């Protein structure tokens, strides 16, 4: 279906569901409104803002078969039940991939973050993280298991090395890569398992009341406890000095331990697990950004790849067990991270 036909279908759905919604919510008559693009992301989803009078709603367009709204609806219920501020689902057409949502605002954390307000904004983000980590999702959400971890890691050699750089791993280099993957997967699987958002980063946190409004949670899994907090402070689009990251991770570790979240018993053990979890994610994201460029025709994400190589270099310098990863990265063509 063309974008124009899809947009027309979306408008027809809104025309059918808005009158009933306005009656149910006691909002009166549906006013004249406009539907304007709100955002898009690295997937096939699109978002529009419906604006009529003084009311603003958000429409998610998640076209099947590439996208499925059902996980979003399910996870939204889990998060709301934990007291996390997520969009209300006001109307839904799961078969056609349409959701009508409450509007959590127009500014993300990424839009407003700076060194002077970071602690003030991150503190409620940590509280929300701990709140949903308390939810028992074993058997409720899919497992972040070995197969998923290895499939994510494989994005790096398949899409970044082979497709983007033209580098094929073979012989001892391939053996080295396999040992790196074994180390990262083993570390992830040894961690306590909790609710994992998977993209808990400033771009997906809204400046809202209360802070933060949480978005983009549809890919949540039951997995390693360090994943989301590592993602929060080692972000795709904004970086922080290492001493600040260290202090923030220590603050999370203390708060989460006090709250009863299962964690490595010492902060040093936690920090090592976070470093290795971060490496797994950084390699995955580099591969994803290359795939988005070459498969989906969206090259802009490659501009943030150097940030992830810097994260990798920091972890390699701190962790002797990552020496083979350092050797592999050093063997790549000059300027490969650009």
Curated annotation (Swiss-Prot):
GO BP of this protein: cell wall organization; peptidoglycan biosynthetic process; peptidoglycan turnover; regulation of cell shape; response to antibiotic
Gene name for this UniProt entry: amgK
Coiled coil region boundaries: none
Key words, A-Z: Antibiotic resistance, ATP-binding, Carbohydrate metabolism, Cell shape, Cell wall biogenesis/degradation, Kinase, Nucleotide-binding, Peptidoglycan synthesis, Transferase
Enzyme Commission numbers on file: 2.7.1.221
Cited Pfam families: APH (PF01636)
Protein name: N-acetylmuramate/N-acetylglucosamine kinase
Catalytic activity: N-acetyl-D-muramate + ATP = N-acetyl-alpha-D-muramate 1-phosphate + ADP + H(+); N-acetyl-D-glucosamine + ATP = N-acetyl-alpha-D-glucosamine 1-phosphate + ADP + H(+)
Matches recorded under InterPro entries: Aminoglycoside_PTrfase, Kinase-like_dom_sf
